[in-house]
C-alpha cells in the first residue's frame, strides 16, 4: 500500500482513540458560499460581454469561410464588417444559430478561446480527436468561460467541456455503469424488466421508465466530460449529426408501439423523456411525442373502467422532460416551446396527470445567467416545475459551492432533486469525488437548508401552486432562517439497481481507495429482483488522500475538509414530498407485468 494513500487507515485508528465532535457552523458556510459568484453578478456579466465580443469576431471569420449553400447563416455579398457584426448579434439570440456554429475541433476551440489553451491541453485534445471523441460546444456556452487573468474561477464549468487524460485513454472501451442500461433483445435487463427491442426504453423501477426518442433528442447542447451515457456516444447511438437524427417516417409507427408498452404495463405511472436531451427535439417532434403520451394516458385510463378494484392498472401521473439546455443553451426556450408545454399541461391535467417536471442540470451558479433566468421564468409560467440534478465533481465539491448553487436556483424558483456522486470507472477518475465528501457536505453544509418537518407541507403547496415561485421561495427561506431549501438527496446511482447512500466502509485497497458495501434505498419500490441481489460492493475511484491533494492543487485549504475522514457510513436521506407520487382514487393492482425473474 502506498504510504501517502494509506493515511486513511491512520485516521480511522486515530478517530477510535480521539473521536472528533462535528459542529456545523452556519456563519462559516455563509462565508464559504460567498466565495462563489453567479452568472447574474454584474462583474461576471461584464466579463462575458467581453467574451461575447471576441466570439462574435471569431464567428464572422467562421461564416466568411463557410461555403454551404444550404446554411441559413450566410452573409450577403458586399456587406460591410459592421453589417456582418449586426447580423451575428441578431442571430446570437437564436438557439439554432449556436447549434449550427458549434465548435467541433480542438483547433477551433483554441481559436475561439483566444489561443489561451496550453500546449499540454491541446496535445490531449488532439489525441481525443484522433480517437474519435466528439467535440461540441456552442458559442453561448463558450462565452461562460473566463480566459482573463482576473475575475471568476470557471473550473466547474471548464471541467465539463475539457477532457481528462483518463477519459481519453479509456474512450473506446467505456462500459455502462448501470447494468440495467445494457439491453439485449428478448432478454430481461439486470432489473428483470422486459423491454421493447432497440434502445428507446430504459427501466429500473416498477413505476417509471425512460423514453429516448429517435430524434434530435439523441443529441445534446454539448458533451459533458462526465456524461453517464458516454458509452452511447462511443457507440454513436447518441451523436451530433443533426440531419441523421431527424425523425424518419418509421418513427411515428415506432412511437405508437413504444407507447403501448407504457399503456399495457400494470405499474408504470411516470415517463421520463430524455436522451441525449429532450429539448433538443424540434418543436414539431416534441409536440408529437407529448401528444402520443397524452393519447396513451387517455387509453390507459379508459381501459381501467372495465377493471375491478384491486385489478386496475397504474395511470399516468407524472411527465418529465430531461434537459440540460437551460444551462447549455437557454435560448432554446422560445414562446413556441413554452406554448407546447402549456398546452400539454392543460390537456393532461384534465385526465389526471398532476406532475409536470423539467428535470434540468445546472452544475455551477456561474451557469445561471440572465438568459437562463428568462428561460426558467417562462417555463414556470407555463405551469411546469423545474428540478435540478447536480453531478458532484471535484470542482463542484469545493466548500460552499453546491450550497450557493441551491440558493441561486431557489431564488429563481428551481428546486433541487439529486446531488449525484460521480459514477463510472477509470474514465471519470479526474472528476471523481469520494462519497465521504458528499456525506460531509450533507451534514455540514446542506443542514442549513433542512426544512423543518412542520413546514414541509407549506413548501410543498408553494412549489405546486404559487407564482412567481422564486420570490415566494426567498420569502419562505427568510421567514424560516434557511440559507436555501435542501430538497435534494445526496446519492450514488448503483451499478445494480437504483440510487442509495446507505453504505459501510469495509476496507481499503492497496492504493488507499475505500471499499464500500451498499444497501438499497428502502424508501421506494424496486423490482422484486432486488430480493435476490443483496448488498452491492463498490471500490471508490479515488482515495480520500488523492482527492484532498487534488483540492490543494486547485487552491483549496484542505484543512477546511479535515472532518472528511469521519464519514465512513452513510444513510440515504428521506425523499421530499414533492417527489412522491400522489395517491390513486382507486385500489391498483400489485401485479407486475413485463417482468421476468
Question: Where in this protein do the model-derived segments appear?
Answer:
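Short, solvent-exposed amphipathic alpha-helical segments in soluble enzyme
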Residues: 227-229, 375-378, 534-535
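Flexible, acidic/Gly-rich N-terminal and inter-domain linker regions that tether
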Residues: 4-204
Amino acid at each position: 500500500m502506498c504510504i501517502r494513500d494509506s493515511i486513511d487507515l491512520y485516521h480511522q485508528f486515530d478517530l477510535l482513540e480521539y473521536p472528533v465532535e462535528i459542529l456545523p457552523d452556519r456563519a462559516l458556510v455563509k462565508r464559504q458560499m460567498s466565495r462563489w459568484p453567479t452568472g447574474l453578478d454584474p462583474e461576471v456579466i461584464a466579463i462575458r460581454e467581453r467574451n461575447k465580443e471576441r466570439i462574435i469576431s471569431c464567428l464572422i471569420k467562421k461564416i466568411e469561410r463557410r461555403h454551404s449553400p444550404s446554411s441559413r447563416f450566410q452573409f450577403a455579398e458586399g456587406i460591410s464588417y459592421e453589417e456582418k457584426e449586426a447580423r451575428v448579434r441578431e442571430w446570437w439570440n437564436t438557439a439554432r444559430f449556436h447549434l449550427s456554429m458549434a465548435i467541433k475541433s480542438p483547433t477551433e476551440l483554441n481559436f475561439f478561446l483566444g489561443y489561451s489553451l496550453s500546449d499540454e491541453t491541446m496535445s490531449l485534445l488532439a489525441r481525443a480527436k484522433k480517437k474519435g471523441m466528439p467535440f461540441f460546444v456552442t458559442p453561448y456556452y463558450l462565452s461562460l468561460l473566463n480566459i482573463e487573468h482576473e475575475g471568476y474561477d470557471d473550473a466547474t464549468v471548464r471541467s465539463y467541456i475539457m477532457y481528462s487524460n483518463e477519459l481519453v485513454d479509456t474512450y473506446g472501451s467505456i462500459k455502462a455503469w448501470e447494468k440495467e442500461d445494457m439491453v439485449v433483445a428478448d432478454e430481461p435487463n439486470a432489473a428483470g424488466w422486459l423491454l421493447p427491442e432497440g434502445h428507446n426504453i430504459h427501466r429500473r423501477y416498477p413505476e417509471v421508465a425512460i423514453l429516448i426518442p429517435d430524434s434530435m433528442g439523441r443529441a445534446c447542447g454539448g458533451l459533458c466530460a462526465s456524461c453517464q451515457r458516454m458509452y452511447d456516444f462511443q457507440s454513436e447511438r447518441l451523436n451530433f449529426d443533426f440531419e441523421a437524427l431527424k425523425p424518419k417516417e418509421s418513427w411515428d409507427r415506432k412511437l405508437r408501439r413504444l407507447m403501448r408498452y407504457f399503456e399495457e404495463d400494470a405499474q408504470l405511472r411516470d415517463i421520463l423523456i430524455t436522451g441525449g436531451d429532450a429539448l433538443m427535439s424540434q418543436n414539431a417532434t416534441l409536440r408529437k411525442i407529448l401528444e402520443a403520451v397524452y393519447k396513451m394516458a387517455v387509453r390507459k385510463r379508459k381501459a381501467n373502467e372495465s377493471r375491478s378494484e384491486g385489478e386496475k392498472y397504474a395511470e399516468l401521473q407524472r411527465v418529465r422532460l430531461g434537459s440540460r439546455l437551460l444551462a447549455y443553451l437557454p435560448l432554446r426556450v422560445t414562446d413556441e416551446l413554452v406554448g407546447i408545454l402549456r398546452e400539454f399541461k392543460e390537456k393532461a391535467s384534465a385526465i389526471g396527470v398532476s406532475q409536470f417536471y423539467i428535470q434540468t442540470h445546472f452544475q455551477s451558479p456561474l451557469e445561471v445567467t440572465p438568459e437562463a433566468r428568462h428561460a426558467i421564468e417562462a417555463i414556470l409560467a407555463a405551469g411546469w416545475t423545474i428540478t435540478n440534478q447536480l453531478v458532484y465533481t471535484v470542482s463542484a465539491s469545493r466548500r460552499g459551492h453546491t450550497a450557493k448553487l441551491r440558493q441561486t436556483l431557489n431564488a429563481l424558483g428551481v428546486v433541487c432533486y439529486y446531488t449525484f456522486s460521480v459514477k463510472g470507472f477509470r474514465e471519470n477518475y479526474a472528476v471523481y469525488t469520494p462519497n465521504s465528501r458528499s456525506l460531509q457536505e450533507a451534514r455540514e453544509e446542506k443542514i442549513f437548508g433542512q426544512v423543518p418537518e412542520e413546514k414541509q407541507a407549506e413548501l410543498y403547496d408553494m412549489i405546486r401552486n404559487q407564482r412567481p415561485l422564486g420570490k415566494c421561495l426567498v420569502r419562505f427561506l427568510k421567514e424560516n432562517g434557511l440559507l436555501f431549501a435542501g430538497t435534494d438527496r445526496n446519492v450514488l446511482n448503483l451499478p445494480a439497481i437504483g440510487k442509495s447512500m446507505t453504505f459501510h466502509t469495509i476496507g481499503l485497497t492497496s492504493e488507499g481507495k475505500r471499499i464500500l458495501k451498499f444497501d438499497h434505498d428502502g424508501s421506494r419500490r424496486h423490482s422484486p429482483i432486488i430480493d435476490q441481489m443483496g448488498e452491492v460492493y463498490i471500490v471508490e475511484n479515488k482515495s480520500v488522500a488523492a482527492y484532498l491533494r487534488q483540492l490543494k492543487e486547485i487552491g483549496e485549504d484542505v484543512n477546511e475538509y479535515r472532518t472528511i475522514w469521519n464519514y465512513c457510513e452513510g444513510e440515504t436521506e428521506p425523499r421530499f414530498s414533492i417527489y412522491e407520487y400522489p395517491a390513486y382514487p382507486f385500489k391498483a393492482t400489485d401485479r407486475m407485468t413485463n417482468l421476468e425473474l
